């Protein structure tokens, strides 16, 4: 709701909307996500569609993992944490989520945390952060719509076998 209100306020302030007409999120285009208006446009355009995809993904993952009372997820390139929001819709209410979101952009809008969850956002380079970790301890590692923004060598660095990522989590 805040996003729509904020964007409407921006639009009615007399700005040149032609600037946003040039913003594209497809075909390898990387818009300036640090611009709050690009964030608003992106979220208004894609948040619900992506959350539906993530809900399906997490539902499938949870069926395979059967996490019990807690699940730990690290989201690499989490943006506004839409994938966390989707995860909260799939796990039982009694299940606690330990969510670690990493993104190079400090998004102005983030999904609201449930009271029982342990949520931490890190505004950092994911490749650097993960490669410095001695051991990866989450149950699942997610690349929500961000995997195409990483080079092959970045992916290899993140997924080093010595970090002991379980096969169900990749």
Language model segments and positions:
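N-terminal auxiliary segments of SAM/dcSAM-dependent transferases
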Residues: 1-24
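Class I SAM-dependent methyltransferase Rossmann-like catalytic core
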Residues: 27-65
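Conserved class I S-adenosyl-L-methionine
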Residues: 69-79
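Conserved SAM-binding loop of SAM-dependent methyltransferases across substrates and taxa
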Residues: 80-94
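Conserved SAM-binding motif I beta-strand of class I
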Residues: 98-103
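S-adenosyl-L-methionine
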Residues: 110-135
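A short SAM/SAH-binding and catalytic strip from SAM-dependent methyltransferases
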Residues: 138-154
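Conserved beta-strand signature within the Rossmann-like core of class I S-adenosyl-L-methionine
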Residues: 166-170
